[in-house]
UniProtKB/Swiss-Prot annotation:
Identification of the protein by name: UDP-N-acetylmuramoyl-tripeptide--D-alanyl-D-alanine ligase
GO MF assignments: ATP binding; UDP-N-acetylmuramoyl-tripeptide-D-alanyl-D-alanine ligase activity
Practical use: As MurF has no human counterpart, it represents an attractive target for the development of new antibacterial drugs. A new series of cyanothiophene-based inhibitors have been designed and synthesized, and identified as micromolar inhibitors of MurF from S.aureus.
Keywords: ATP-binding, Cell cycle, Cell division, Cell shape, Cell wall biogenesis/degradation, Cytoplasm, Ligase, Nucleotide-binding, Peptidoglycan synthesis
GO biological process, one term: peptidoglycan biosynthetic process
């Protein structure tokens, strides 16, 4: 993490610091006054309900090395210690992160996409970690606050920084890309997330493609070549190498399934390189192909990439498998959802042997298209050989309505507890249960009830 003096910070960003404090060392950054450790820099924000400047005095008393303070904000008479006066604390955080990133000077890999950002980030880290010192975004620290905080967690000897970039509207990824100036930019796919803000999948593709705006000259852009909506934006990328991945044969890296079972999927790249992935889902084959492309660009050997992918582990609640007694498999894919990722989950479940039980919750943030898209997920069940469909949530009722005719058994629930009770009583040996819904639905509670 960042470990510099206030004098160094003063040379990096517009600010004022009393001379007597310039030799004070800073070790780490936090925006949470409850998480202060010795010599941390505390950064307060003015929120709608709470002004973080109220906690500056306590942060300093608790051992903070210094604190940002926004000019024009009344200062408590109890504040005593190193204060860094700035025009705006958020802007100063972002400026500090950009300066520190230049100081550390790692190769930056930026990852965005409607689905699979975190999974792809995890896979890239797995591919690279034996050859480089790698640091990646933790959790969903992928916005205008989280990304700078991630950068400030880099150690001085970090060689690769993998930065996840999220957004809910236009120009947000453009800002993050300009801040981070990636060497490699990645778009995993285009789905329907944030449709209510961006209006259409075309709008989502445009917003995601902003990741190339800050791409360094002679950088690399890796993208889902199976997505037609990205092609117009690829043509706008200048002074960069563009690499398409996907199942279509016109891609630079063509991935094709060799075999799959309850332990994962085996696939081949360009009919030459064979890989074994211990994760379910054809969509994860494409995420892995992106990681392979990154490995190629950074000069890794086939054997290194193969071994590292074979041992990949993902952030929780992404196709996370639990094996219960009597050969029952529960797949926790409940971290988040979109119609696209739900269809991918259905495809994955349909390839497994045993009775296939699908548990789906609402997909949120779809705006006026929500009903139509939930109906579409239900219709997608046709000829997918799903045996049981359980749904929960107001919007998921539309999945039930359109999907019940395509399964042997279906039931919609208004209570999560009721669904859990029915499911537990219904489980049989060799069942395969897949659970998916938007983050706000908290369907991991269903998984926890099954595995506890």
């Amino acid at each position: 993490m960042i470990n510099v003096t206030l004098k160094q910070i003063q040379s990096w960003i517009p600010c004022e610091i009393e001379d007597q404090f310039l030799n004070q060392e800073i070790n780490g950054v936090t925006i949470d006054s409850r998480a202060i450790s010795k010599n941390m820099l505390f950064i307060p924000f003015k929120g709608e309900n709470v002004d973080g400047h109220r906690f500056v005095s306590k942060a300093l008393q608790d051992g903070a090395g210094a604190a940002f303070y926004q000019r024009g904000t009344p200062i408590d008479e109890n504040v005593s210690g190193p204060i860094i006066w700035v025009e705006d604390t958020l802007t100063a955080l972002q400026q500090l992160a950009q300066a520190y990133l230049r100081h550390v000077n790692p190769k930056v890999i930026a990852v965005t996409g409607s689905n699979g950002k975190t999974t792809t980030k995890d896979m890239i880290e797995s591919v690279l970690h034996t050859e480089f010192k790698v640091k990646k975004t933790q959790g969903n620290y992928n916005n205008e606050i989280g990304l700078p905080l991630t950068i400030l967690e880099l150690d001085n000897d970090t060689e690769i920084s993998i930065l996840e970039m999220g957004m809910s509207g236009f120009h947000e990824i453009e800002f993050l890309s300009n801040l981070a100036q990636p060497d490699i930019a990645v778009i995993t796919n285009i789905g329907e997330s944030h449709m209510q803000d961006l209006g259409s999948r075309e709008g989502i593709a445009k917003a995601k493609s902003e990741i190339t705006i800050g791409l360094k000259d002679n950088g690399t852009f890796i993208y889902d070549g199976d997505e037609p909506l990205l092609k117009p934006h690829v043509k706008e990328v200048e002074n960069a190498k563009c690499i398409s991945i996907g199942v279509a044969t016109d891609n630079a890296l063509v991935c094709s399934v060799d075999d799959r079972d309850t332990t994962g999927i085996s696939f081949t790249i360009n009919n030459k390189e064979h890989y074994d992935l211990p994760i379910l889902g054809k969509h994860n084959m494409k995420n892995a192909t992106i990681a392979i492309a990154v490995g190629h660009e950074l000069g890794l050997t086939y054997n290194t990439i193969y071994q590292n992918l074979k041992n990949v582990s993902l952030t929780g609640m992404r196709m996370e498998q639990h094996t219960l007694e009597n050969d029952i498999t529960v797949i926790n894919d409940a971290y988040n959802a979109s119609p696209t990722s739900m269809r991918a989950a259905i495809d994955t479940l349909s390839t497994l042997t045993g009775r296939r039980i699908l548990i789906l919750g609402d997909v949120l943030e779809l705006g006026e298209n929500s009903k139509e898209m939930h109906i579409g997920v239900g219709n997608y069940l046709e000829e997918k050989h799903i045996d049981v469909l359980y749904t929960f949530g107001n919007e998921a009722k539309y999945i039930y309505d359109s999907g019940q005719q395509h399964v042997e058994k279906a039931q919609h629930f208004n209570s999560k507890d009721d669904m859990i009770e029915v499911l537990i009583n219904d489980l049989k040996a060799h069942d395969r249960v897949l659970v998916k819904g938007s983050r706000g639905m908290k369907l991991e509670e269903v998984v926890n009830a099954l595995i506890s």
